[in-house]
Amino acid sequence: MRRMRFSPRSSFARTLLLIVTLLFVSLVTTYLVVLNFAILPSLQQFNKVLAYEVRMLMTDKLQLEDGTQLVVPPAFRREIYRELGISLYTNEAAEEAGLRWAQHYEFLSHQMAQQLGGPTEVRVEVNKSSPVVWLKTWLSPNIWVRVPLTEIHQGDFSPLFRYTLAIMLLAIGGAWLFIRIQNRPLVDLEHAALQVGKGIIPPPLREYGASEVRSVTRAFNHMAAGVKQLADDRTLLMAGVSHDLRTPLTRIRLATEMMGEEDGYLAESINKDIEECNAIIEQFIDYLRTGQEMPMEMADLNSVLGEVIAAESGYEREINTALQAGSIQVKMHPLSIKRAVANMVVNAARYGNGWIKVSSGTESHRAWFQVEDDGPGIKPEQRKHLFQPFVRGDSARSTSGTGLGLAIVQRIIDNHNGMLEIGTSERGGLSIRAWLPVPVARVQGTTKEA
């Protein structure tokens, strides 16, 4: 069972996640600092002032600074009530006036109890206009004091929320844009590296971005230039070797033409060896040629397979077909696909016992073609090495050849962004299926067998 990954894989996502996390931590830290050093001290001061007001309203006498006791007339107390908007309610009346919707705050009750010197309950009612504070003190346990905070409005906090949200969105958007700009050279490097992996040397990349990225880009350009020079030298070397080898082979062929009839069997054997040498040279050149960039075009896969089948039929070969009815339009390089199919058919003819089957189809927006034989097959542990250059399977399939035929097929399919699958044919031999994961114009129909 695969373990689930919760961390992002790409550097873009990781950097963006880091910036968002730091921004969130910064906002939380700012909130805690403002809460502890601004809001809570202000709230304590508010509670202290409110406690003084309640104490003055709940007692008949006030003690002045010089110790004098001052009696508060009822009319003066009512005037203070009116100016401050304070009203008194019994328990039942308070419930009807909104106490039932108020929420109890323990820390406010604790602070108010310290200021008033006895048990105090504080509740806060939040309505559409302004919050309301409800108090019940030990000075008058059956009376609720309603204090509206008229200077505080619910709309006062909306701009703060909008500004905070706007700052967060701007910070995240800026971080996303910054990281995208920083990662753009890396994306170019990735695409270029994939092309080099397919044997296609891209033009030199533009050196931009951070100094470290420019250094990597510069090193990559040097490496790509070196790989291109090496490939050009290899191609030139093989072209020269093939030319130099074909010259004496041609002279040998001319010499066999001058041999007498009594040496006809010897001349025929020499000509077969010459043809085999020419075939080996052609395979080397084909292997080098498949690494070059190929122009793609839309073509019918069944038509390409049909041309190869027509060309390879005969020569004591029985080629059966099971092609999907209709046209399978695939973006490909037709000549290269023909070469791949021909190599697969030749491989099946060389190692099989005369029976060959070529089939095609579409599945999950991918096209495929398959070549099967009735030979001894390949052991499963050896199949992964079959497409490597100069590998010809196990000893049961050891015959003449360079071992480049299927390696050429692998490079051609790789250049088409495809993949190869090896299996067992319906007659116990080898089955090779090539997938072309490109847009396919699929038609309705059945498979045609011949």
Swiss-Prot record:
Show the SMART domains listed in the entry: HAMP, HATPase_c, HisKA
Quick check: keyword Lyase in the entry?
Answer: no
List where the protein spans the membrane: 16-35, 159-179
Q: What happens when the gene is disrupted?
A: Double knockout with ompR leads to decreased expression of genes encoding virulence proteins. Double knockout with ompR decreases virulence in mouse.
One Pfam family name is HisKA
Give the Enzyme Commission number.
Answer: 2.7.13.3
* Start and end residues of each Histidine kinase domain: 240-440
Q: Which of the residues bear the PTM Phosphohistidine? A: H243
Q: Which reaction does it catalyse?
A: ATP + protein L-histidine = ADP + protein N-phospho-L-histidine
PTM comment, free text:
Autophosphorylated.
Keyword Flavoprotein part of the UniProt annotation: no
Binding sites annotated in the UniProt record for ATP: H243, N347, A348, A349, R350, Y351, D373, R392, G393, T402, G403, L404, G405, L406
Renumbered residue ranges of the record's region Cytoplasmic dimerization domain (CDD), when dimerized forms osmosensitive core: 223-289
Annotated Gene Ontology cellular components are: plasma membrane
Q: Which InterPro entries match?
A: 2C_sensor_his_kinase (IPR050980), HAMP_dom (IPR003660), HATPase_C_sf (IPR036890), His_kinase_dom (IPR005467), HisK_dim/P_dom (IPR003661), HisK_dim/P_sf (IPR036097), Sig_transdc_His_kin-like_C (IPR004358)
| All ranges on the Periplasmic side of the membrane | 36-158
Write out the annotated subcellular location: Cell inner membrane
Q: Where is the signal peptide?
A: none
MF terms from GO for this chain are:
ATP binding; phosphorelay sensor kinase activity
Which domain of life does this protein belong to?
Answer: Bacteria
UniProt entry keywords in alphabetical sequence? ATP-binding, Cell inner membrane, Cell membrane, Kinase, Membrane, Nucleotide-binding, Phosphoprotein, Stress response, Transferase, Transmembrane, Transmembrane helix, Two-component regulatory system
Question: Topology: which residues are Cytoplasmic?
Answer: 1-15, 180-450
Q: How does it assemble?
A: Homodimer.
Protein's job: Member of the two-component regulatory system EnvZ/OmpR involved in osmoregulation (particularly of genes ompF and ompC) as well as other genes. EnvZ functions as a membrane-associated protein kinase that phosphorylates OmpR in response to environmental signals; at low osmolarity OmpR activates ompF transcription, while at high osmolarity it represses ompF and activates ompC transcription.
Read off the domain note.
Answer: Has several major domains; the N-terminal cytoplasmic domain is followed by 2 transmembrane helices that anchor the protein in the membrane; the periplasmic domain between the helices interacts with MrzA. The cytoplasmic C-terminal domain has a HAMP domain joined by a flexible linker to a histidine kinase domain. The HAMP domain by itself is intrinsically disordered. The cytoplasmic dimerization domain (CDD) forms an osmosensitive core and includes the autophosphorylated histidine residue.
Q: What is this protein called?
A: Sensor histidine kinase EnvZ
Q: Which gene encodes it?
A: envZ
